[in-house]
């Protein structure tokens, strides 16, 4: 029997075994995880940081089996495990003809958000989707697309999103797209640095530019995991007038809200990502920003 076909109870047994292997034997990215956690929380003792670290690996293995289960779980069973809050605010935006955008970080299980469209009842025609970066392997790329679209959402490659959104607007199609916006940009894509988890952090600003261009109502998606296999996704309105906000204000507000989410329960953040590998000192040494573009000095 494949992993995806096993009941959740059996999946979490597999997850526990994988956690032991990943943490104690393979030691997957242990150095990066430890460094990220201790530098993000200098006020915490080493024992507290190790507790977060162990919790992270346990959640990370759960995330994997929960995501694989998306390929076989029924919509009814999935909805029994997740709760959406703030959907009424999204439907109010759709009622007045305004499209929406959700912005979130790599926290909790972001893959389960593909089920959002199942709870938007007043506008069943609305397009609910996520933006993704295609994988190098066509096989795994197709596998992940099918998995993410199994709950009725659509996947749009990052490079094509603006074209899709313009097309939806020309057809008067209401839509809600999710942007995972806490990745580490390459040097040539750095236009803004922000304080985030005790680091001077380079951040992407492309999501905000698209939201302004499309006049989206922007929602921060707060994630909670009250118990194993249960998630609460709360859509919190950041603004329904993005064009009236100062430049980069949406991005700044997002990172403040994301840090609040992480500090509430740190173990569910993706600490294995080498988030702070690029520094402002290295950037300033080789690059500068001219007329909104990053160029070499």
Regions found by a protein language model. Name each.
Residues 25, 81-82, 136, 157, ...:
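Residues that cap or flank secondary-structure elements
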Residues 91, 115, 208-209:
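Alpha-helical segments flanking ligand/cofactor-binding loops in enzyme cores
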Residues 96-159, 186-195:
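Catalytic core of membrane glycerolipid acyltransferases/transacylases, capturing the structured
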